[in-house]
UniProtKB/Swiss-Prot annotation:
InterPro entries: Peptide/Ni-bd, SBP_5, SBP_5_dom. Belongs to the bacterial solute-binding protein 5 family. Keywords: Periplasm, Signal, Transport. This is Glutathione-binding protein GsiB. Part of the ABC transporter complex GsiABCD involved in glutathione import. Binds glutathione. PANTHER family: GLUTATHIONE-BINDING PROTEIN GSIB, PERIPLASMIC BINDING COMPONENT OF ABC TRANSPORTER. GO terms for molecular function: peptide transmembrane transporter activity. It holds the Pfam family SBP_bac_5. It is found in: Periplasm.
Amino acid sequence: MTQFITHKWLAALGLASSIAAFPALAAKDVVVAVGSNFTTLDPYDANDTLSQAVAKSFYQGLFGLDKDMKVKNVLAEGYTVSDDGLTYTITLRQGVKFQDGADFDAAAVKANLDRASNPDNHLKRYNLYKNIAKTEVVDPVTVKITLKQPFSAFINILAHPATAMISPQALEKYGKDIGFHPVGTGPYQLETWNQTDFVKVKKFSGYWQQGLPKLDSITWRPVTDNNTRAAMLQTGEAQFAFPIPYEQAALLAKNKNLELVASPSIMQRYISMNVTQKPFDNPKVREALNYAINRQALVKVAFAGYATPATGVVPPSIAYAQSYQPWPYDPAKARELLKEAGYPDGFSTTLWSSHNHSTAQKVLQFTQQQLAQIGIKARITAMDAGQRAAEVEGKGQKESGVRMFYTGWSASTGEADWALSPLFASQNWPPTQFNTALYSNKQVDSDLAAALKTNDPQEKTRLYKEAQDIIWKESPWIPLVVEKLVSAHSKNLTGFWIMPDTGFSFDDADLK
């Protein structure tokens, strides 16, 4: 609006022709090729990291995580915690506007957290916020959040990409359709969403951080085929691509116009086994399958060396992670265990995948071949985001068709609870959360709950170690690898990188 009026008055003054004489600055438009489709632009209703990463174009939280996964202030300026650990008082940044002109204030925070913590809204990320008892406005720049019980990782929850501040006016206007109409305080605002092709965002002129953003637009384009993603970089159709096909990393590194980056990750890849169903209810079967997979070979075949064999159920860079001796590759031991379990000739099963990109296909095919060597016939199905949401995340134990499920997890809060509880706590079977092994152990449940109630690091260490020791011994998973994150970008693109949880950081991105 302001820009239009300025041009109008300049024309009236007869200066438009002189302005036209100057060469126009080249638009700073960036295309980002990503490996899968988006599910929604409502961060509170997205289970996939990619949708939440793209939503960071429009949205910000009270807190965020830096590239080392440490908590930083964003829309909050600071906070205090009561002695009993139940009340968090947060001071807010002043002078921030939503993209629809509404003020960001304590009432906006309350509107968002009330929505997120209300089970009647059936938001997929409800479990992050279910411990909130109430949110109160103290004054326009102060909000008080009271918890139902102490939860020592709560600030990390507020730093999770899901905890975005959405304009209350937009929430009221669009209701359940807010996922198609994002309105936040972020550096970019929605221009176009072609649900089968791309999301394009444009610079928000009213952004509160002076001098930002530096780009005029970002187009997020899903490209599931690894080779096509790499080709788009080579031809200049894209300026950033992730993930890079591992087998093409060396080739891209030789391109003088591109920069290849291999960065640390908290992305763990694993196969869960539904322990409520035969034959996976038998611990010897689960052990056998762990012996059947040559993880070192998998690293080479599927990840071209850009991964390390898993040494636990929590990636090593997460606090309180425990490391163990990796499972050795021993197919003879695997066959022996199957025989002891009553399956001397093996069995048939299904292996589903939460991804359908080329790397996932390689993992599935490799695993299928490895299992065949010990007599297990696995029928593989690679799912897209919609299938995964319907068949895996949306069904309870009785309806679930999940047997073996290849997927990945990154603890996007940067702490141990989110690396363990959603995946192993008894109350977190689908459709509640992501315990696709349908694993249950009372001691593990007790340890995870107790760890959240204490601020004593030594006690936390003891509790998280005991829980991980039990899980590792009972083997509801086949832990596979921890990925290295390989991205590539045009050398004239700066300030755009991959976070350890596979999200994106692009606040300072610029095209030189």
